[in-house]
């Protein structure tokens, strides 16, 4: 799809777009009556009217199609059109970043999305440019522009907009990141985190809150603490933030105030927030009926503020538009929209065979890398230092790589010193501290990745990763799939995990099994220094998001040291390692538990002559099933051991796969050994009771051999 300029409006999907060039009220007068009409001539004003009508007519057509049973869902923008078109006239998708929310139809059309393309999404067609039929309608996205795939979770877009703005600032690009939502979404913490980050760094972000006073059925007074229910008033403490509360049903006021906001942003003084008071003339969505919670009187008052009727009245009053001309335009637009819908309806449907495509990168990059090209032969190194060295090497190799997180800059260099020296070497533009806000870390990283950078972020403890889960699951891991391969966010998420350090409930958690449920996310869990370096370097080079689990108890353990690999050493994802060969039983494990299994296996061999094969899976996703199955078919017995809880632990998934594929080869039950299903206590006595001990592992392996 070709790029579309936002300063152009569409007469029809087949015609070229006509430019609307505001004159700021100077010199340009209407040819009909000599009046200065807010700096716009007749053609410009008619083009603006056509775009508003295009959005309105499209909404109504979509709802009629739904009633006919041809579609399933729609969210209307009716009542929001004036401010949306005013914004669209001043934002360029070839240059600026756009994060329009689902009700931002007018802005999307101004960005160059055609009515036919909107209907391709409505009908969930294969040629839908936003998602290929994978997402709900009006979840915008355009390839070859700067309008990335948008999603349903309200508020996740704000931090991504901050990320693209930060990327622009780091690259020295002068542009604006536009992001919108309704007023209800401003109750989300990520909105406040985004305004905070943008204001603190004076980033070029234009926040537009389209306040129609209802979040589905919840009125604004139940959402917002600002004076008179105002979001702009609520944000008054951000001193670098330009704030304006405007009548979003008035095109001219909207245009002027958006212009002022963009001028402020481009001056470098900070971000801007426009609160546009609009009206919601249709129910929240096709699944809602606002007559159940709004009075007829209130709905009538909103109708009296209809932005299109206000604009048409202005044009008629100033002799720009006659009744006959208006009727003709309405008919032309209706025909255009009907024809667009007809063309979209006839487009091909998605193929069922493609449903699993584009979960991960399919470019062949991963497969082309030269893995484990030589044996690690350097000086012995502890795991935390191997991670540090990998980051240094990859930062030197890739100037688009950025590292940030809590306390990661020098002089601290991370609470475990994994990032020590990086900010000194590469500067605080590329290696920097983030706010203490995990959602911010991931959301901003997603935006930076959309802008073509390679963010490698640190989450200080796995126990505190949960505020970022929305960003990781619904944005990072879903971006490529939901956009049908148009966009991706290959963020690397480094996170310290695991117990055995007397960390108590909130410094000891394992998180891998929960994240293994997230499609589109690779998960690494190295157990030694060489693998940690090789896997991390691979994560930094591939085009897929990676959760990189680093066990705190292995950072400086002598038994997890390795000869340091060189700078070209890469370890493939999905390739397990047999750390000890054997023939009596297979042990499948990872992390600290792998080492306890290894030492238990050595002891069993020394004491009883038992031959135990120990497999370190190295990556949770993808899982090397082939190596596991081959071993089980040889030994005929298997036990899966990990530190996470037994119930819901990843060992259950491994056991199920073995049962499905190797059942006829088994001479005993598939055993699992894991932590008790309780939180991890602080007391060493209690912690050692909860987590699997080396003696328990020794006994578990021995019992299965002797079964």
Segments predicted by a language model, with ranges:
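Alpha-helix C-terminal capping segments
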Residues: 85-94, 162-173, 195-201, 236-238, ...
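A glycine-rich helix N-cap at a beta->alpha junction
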Residues: 124-128, 199-209, 430-433, 476-495
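Conserved acidic/glycine
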Residues: 1-83, 89-90, 276, 282, ...
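Cofactor-binding active-site loop characterized by glycine-rich and histidine/acidic residues
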Residues: 57, 64-203, 208, 219-238, ...
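Glycine/charged-rich beta-loop-alpha catalytic/anionic-binding loops adjacent to active sites
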Residues: 65-70, 137-151, 174-178, 239-243, ...
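Glycine-rich ThDP/TPP pyrophosphate-binding loop and its adjacent helix/strand module
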Residues: 146-338, 346, 516-636, 640-641
């Amino acid at each position: 799809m070709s790029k579309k300029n936002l300063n152009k409006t569409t007469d029809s999907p087949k015609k070229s777009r006509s430019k609307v060039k505001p004159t700021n009220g100077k010199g340009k007068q209407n040819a009909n009556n000599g009046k200065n009409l807010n700096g716009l001539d007749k053609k410009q004003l008619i083009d603006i009217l056509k775009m508003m009508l295009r959005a309105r007519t499209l909404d109504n057509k979509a709802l009629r199609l739904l009633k006919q049973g041809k579609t399933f869902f729609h969210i209307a923008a009716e009542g929001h059109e004036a401010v949306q078109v005013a914004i669209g006239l001043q934002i360029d998708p070839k240059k600026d970043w756009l994060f329009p929310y689902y009700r931002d139809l007018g802005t999307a059309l101004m960005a160059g999305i055609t009515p036919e393309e909107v209907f391709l999404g409505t009908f969930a067609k294969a040629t839908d440019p936003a998602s290929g039929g994978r997402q709900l309608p009006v979840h915008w996205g355009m390839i070859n522009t700067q309008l990335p795939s948008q999603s349903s979770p309200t508020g996740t877009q704000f931090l991504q907009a901050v990320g693209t703005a930060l990327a622009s600032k780091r690259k020295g690009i002068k542009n604006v990141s536009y992001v919108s939502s309704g007023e209800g979404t401003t109750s989300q913490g990520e909105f406040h985190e985004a305004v905070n980050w943008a204001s603190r760094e004076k980033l070029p972000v234009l926040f537009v809150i389209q306040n129609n006073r209802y979040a589905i059925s919840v009125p604004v007074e139940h959402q917002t603490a600002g004076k008179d229910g105002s979001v702009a008033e609520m944000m008054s403490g951000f001193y670098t933030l330009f704030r304006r509360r405007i009548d979003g049903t008035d095109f001219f006021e909207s245009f002027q105030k958006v212009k002022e906001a963009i001028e402020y942003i481009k001056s470098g003084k900070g971000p801007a927030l426009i609160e546009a008071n609009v009206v919601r003339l249709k129910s929240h969505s096709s699944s809602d009926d606002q007559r159940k919670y709004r009075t007829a009187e209130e709905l009538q008052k909103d109708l009296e503020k209809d932005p299109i009727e206000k604009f048409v009245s202005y044009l008629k009053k100033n002799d720009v538009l006659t009744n006959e001309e208006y009727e003709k335009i309405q008919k032309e637009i209706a025909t255009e929209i009907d024809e667009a819908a007809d063309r979209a309806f006839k487009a091909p449907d998605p193929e069922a065979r493609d449903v699993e495509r584009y979960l991960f990168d399919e470019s062949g990059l991963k497969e082309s890398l030269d893995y484990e090209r030589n044996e690690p032969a350097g000086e012995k190194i502890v795991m935390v230092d191997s991670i540090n060295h990998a980051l240094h090497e990859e930062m030197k190799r890739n100037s688009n790589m950025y590292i940030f997180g809590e306390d990661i800059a020098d002089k601290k260099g991370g609470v475990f010193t994994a990032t020590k020296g990086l900010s000194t070497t590469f500067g605080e533009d590329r290696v920097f501290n983030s706010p203490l806000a995990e959602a911010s870390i991931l959301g901003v990283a997603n935006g930076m990745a959309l802008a073509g950078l390679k963010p490698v972020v640190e989450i200080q403890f796995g126990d505190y990763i949960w505020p970022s889960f929305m960003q990781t699951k619904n944005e990072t891991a879903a971006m490529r799939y939901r956009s049908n391969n148009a966009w991706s966010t290959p963020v690397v998420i480094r996170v310290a995990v695991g117990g055995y350090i007397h960390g108590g409930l909130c410094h000891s958690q394992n998180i891998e099994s929960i994240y293994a449920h997230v499609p589109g996310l690779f998960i690494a869990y190295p157990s030694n220094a060489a693998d940690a370096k090789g896997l991390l370097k691979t994560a930094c080079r591939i085009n897929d998001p990676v959760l990189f689990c680093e066990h705190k108890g292995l950072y400086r353990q002598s038994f997890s040291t390795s000869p340091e690999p060189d700078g070209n050493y890469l370890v493939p994802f999905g390739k397990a390692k047999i750390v000890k060969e054997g023939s009596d039983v297979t042990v499948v494990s990872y992390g600290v538990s792998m080492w306890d299994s290894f030492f238990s296996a050595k002891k069993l061999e020394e004491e009883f002559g038992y031959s135990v094969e120990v497999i370190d899976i190295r990556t949770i996703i993808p899982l090397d099933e082939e190596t596991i199955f081959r071993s089980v078919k040889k030994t005929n017995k298997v036990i899966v051991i990990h530190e996470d809880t037994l119930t819901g632990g990843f060992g259950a998934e491994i056991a199920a796969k073995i049962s499905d594929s190797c059942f006829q080869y088994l001479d005993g039950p598939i055993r699992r050994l894991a932590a008790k299903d309780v939180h991890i206590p602080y007391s060493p006595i209690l912690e050692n009771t909860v987590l699997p001990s080396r003696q328990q592992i020794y006994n578990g392996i021995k019992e299965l051999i002797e079964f």
